[in-house]
Amino acid sequence: MIPSRISHKFPLFLRSSLAAPKAAYRFSSTIPKPSDQVPDVDAFLNKIGRNCNELKDTFENNWNNLFQWDSKILKEKGVNIQQRKYILKQVHNYRNNRPIHEIKLGKKSFFGGERKRKAFTAKWKAENKQ
């Protein structure tokens, strides 16, 4: 037997679980219109750089594909993880009216990362003294 205090909440639980999935409505109203600077998918991919313009055939030059596809779909299309994350970040920025521009890849230091830099520098100097 179901206690009386839970029984009045049970139909609400059923009603919410049987509702249409939220994923279907996820990006329906958040697809921005193309601007003068970014009129189509090809221009968007050229503007963000990092050789993303090679993927214009993947998006089929369709503005809706660019803003509706998630990481799972891009993975199925064969886009590598670094470009997927980068494109989705730039799409998110454009959707939120933030400026989009190319973010250059970082360059590794000759002496390694920040944590071990002192050790590598000391080792390199010791080798060069001899």
UniProtKB/Swiss-Prot annotation:
SMART domains xrefs: IGR (SM01238)
Molecular functions (GO terms): structural constituent of ribosome
* Gene behind the chain: FYV4
What is this protein's record name? Small ribosomal subunit protein mS41
* Extra remark: Present with 2630 molecules/cell in log phase SD medium.
GO CC field: mitochondrial inner membrane; mitochondrial small ribosomal subunit; mitochondrion
Keyword Cell cycle listed: no
Residues of the transit peptide: 1-27
GO BP: mitochondrial translation
